[in-house]
Curated annotation (Swiss-Prot):
Organism for this UniProt entry: Arabidopsis thaliana
Keywords annotated in UniProt: ATP-binding, Cell membrane, Kinase, Lipoprotein, Membrane, Nucleotide-binding, Phosphoprotein, Plant defense, Serine/threonine-protein kinase, Transferase
Protein name, as recorded: Serine/threonine-protein kinase PBL36
SUPFAM superfamilies documented for this protein: Protein kinase-like (PK-like) (SSF56112)
Keyword check for Kinase: yes
Binding of ATP, residues: 132-140, 164
Region of interest (Disordered), residue spans: 431-476
GO biological process: defense response; lipopolysaccharide-mediated signaling pathway; pattern recognition receptor signaling pathway
Lipoprotein in keyword set: yes
Function of the molecule: Involved in chitin-triggered immune signaling and is required for reactive oxygen species (ROS) production. Acts downstream of SD129 in defense signaling triggered by the pathogen-associated molecular pattern (PAMP) 3-OH-C10:0, a medium-chain 3-hydroxy fatty acid.
Location of the protein in the cell: Cell membrane
Modification after translation, per record: Phosphorylated by SD129 in response to the pathogen-associated molecular pattern (PAMP) 3-OH-C10:0, a medium-chain 3-hydroxy fatty acid.
């Protein structure tokens, strides 16, 4: 778990994630932009705590069993000239307060029902030291409970969990909370994060998950100093593909995930990938229908173009999103990065002309790998990405086909760094020094780093690591 000081440095450095969410709402304007570190960590924390406490004070304390829902932050920017349909056929989004009725929750014998005070004790009173991070739903705290019960236990014993609290003024709300329970509470697979249980007490809404010690894929790809080794990247891609394949083809009732991205792929201690955050998930159409019509929701840069333009949602929309994430894994670049030169800001459009070029594909690969990747594996992975990103949704493969294509890749050992043909493929700079992965290297530069998969740092499993107010409740 990231330390408190490290967590706040991450927030100060990153601020609003560039290009990932499309247009951010005005309430985010106080968050620092990338690279702006003019404020001290103490002043940043003070401002954040004060603003969160102020927002909570606005909530009517007389509310009972009502979730205050803010405008969702996951609304996709509508393409100019192609407005999304206004008709909504039951998408999982929030636009107004929704009364909670017990009938809205699907019964699941797999879930534990927690008391608020038990979770308060399990997280050590939601103290800052237990904070893992914050997302659109609210703040997430580390806690410890009984292995097979709901009572809190001493830190370091029992079952380690991640407790997600609903922020009444947050960017996701009641419908997302329900969707998370109704989907994850009834879906069990090694590639899905396990939902342990939930708390629904007065106006408190909390979710309890298994703890994922390695954090998110996003954190490892874009925020860590050491790069993920090639074999680990392929292992993660395969695991995430298995999760989508289960949702689309193996679940009793097929599910469209709708929010597949690197921040929603969490990693356990062995770097096994698991999908999290089912707040935007929807039931897939039955055999009589070709698609689900819904308002466009998701994250800019990952959504399939036909979905953004028409609002028609299918399992092939998830396949496109997988192709984007696979590109991020291969290149080490974000799906949208406004800090890059024109022509390179949109990852898909930048790589599309080169995906099937066997003589130039290596230029797309993350230069931090320094040639430590399988040549055959990289060629196959780029081919799979190209198929998933096909503009014709019907031509995209099923996720089960993607799984079969990726299965051999983590174990291939034909590393480019030991290939003489790879060395001759590298472009030569003006000073006569060959480059790797499209970047220049020094003649007397340091030797290649060891990319062991066993010594990478752990990370918080949630997007933002910020100090946060405690959920409302009486002191014990």
């Amino acid at each position: 778990m990231a330390t408190k000081l490290e967590s706040f440095k991450v927030v100060e450095k990153l601020g609003v994630e560039k290009g990932e969410k499309g247009k951010m709402m005005s309430k985010k304007k106080n968050v620092k932009k990338d690279g702006d570190e003019s404020e001290s960590g103490f002043w940043f924390r003070f401002k954040f705590i004060f603003s969160c406490i102020s927002s909570r004070s606005k909530v009517d304390s007389s509310m009972n069993a009502t979730a205050v829902i803010a405008e969702p932050k996951k609304v996709i920017e509508k393409l100019e000239g192609h407005p999304a349909p206004t008709k909504d056929t039951g998408c999982a989004e929030s636009g107004s307060s929704t009364p909670l009725m017990s009938g809205e929750l699907k019964y699941s014998s797999k879930l534990r029902i927690f008391m608020f005070n038990d979770l308060k004790l399990a997280t050590r009173n939601f103290r800052p030291e237990s904070l893992l991070g914050e997302g659109g739903f609210g703040c997430v705290f580390k806690g410890w409970i009984e292995e097979n019960g709901t009572a809190p236990v001493k830190p370091g014993t029992g079952l380690t969990v991640a407790v997600k609290t609903l922020n009444p003024d947050g960017l996701q709300g009641h419908k997302e909370w329900l969707a998370e329970i109704n989907f994850l509470g009834n879906l069990v697979h090694p590639s899905l994060v396990k939902l342990v249980g939930y708390c629904m007490e007065e106006d408190q809404r909390l979710l309890v998950y298994e703890f994922m010690p390695r954090g998110s894929l996003e954190n490892h790809l874009f925020r860590r100093t050491l790069p993920l080794p090639w074999s680990v990247r392929m292992k993660i891609a395969l695991g995430a593909a298995k999760g989508l394949a289960f949702l689309h083809e193996e679940a009793e009732k097929p599910v469209i995930y709708r929010d597949f991205k690197t921040s929603n792929i969490l990693l356990d201690g062995e770097y096994n990938a698991k999908l999290s955050d089912f707040g935007l998930a929807k039931d897939a159409p039955d055999e009589k229908k070709s698609h689900v019509s819904t308002r466009v929701m998701g994250t800019y840069g990952y959504a399939a173009p036909e979905y953004v333009m028409t609002g028609h949602l299918t399992t092939k929309s998830d396949v496109y999103s997988f192709g984007v994430v696979l590109l991020e894994i291969l290149t080490g670049r974000r799906s949208v990065d406004k800090s890059r030169p024109n022509g390179e800001q949109n990852l898909v459009e930048w790589v599309r002309p080169h995906l099937l070029d066997k003589k130039r594909f290596y230029r797309l690969l993350d230069p931090r790998l320094e040639g430590h990747y399988s040549i055959k594996g990289a060629q196959k992975a780029t081919q799979v990405a190209a198929q998933c990103l096909n503009r014709d949704s019907k031509a995209r493969p099923k996720m089960s086909e993607v799984v079969e294509a990726l299965k051999p890749l983590p174990n291939l050992k034909d590393f480019a760094s030991s290939s003489s043909s790879f060395q001759t493929m590298q472009p030569v700079a003006k000073n006569g020094v060959r480059t790797q992965g499209g970047g220049f290297v020094s003649r007397n530069g340091p030797p290649m780093r060891s990319l062991s998969s066993l010594n990478l740092p752990q990370a918080s499993p949630y997007r933002y690591a910020r100090q946060s107010p405690k959920p409302k409740g009486k002191e014990p």
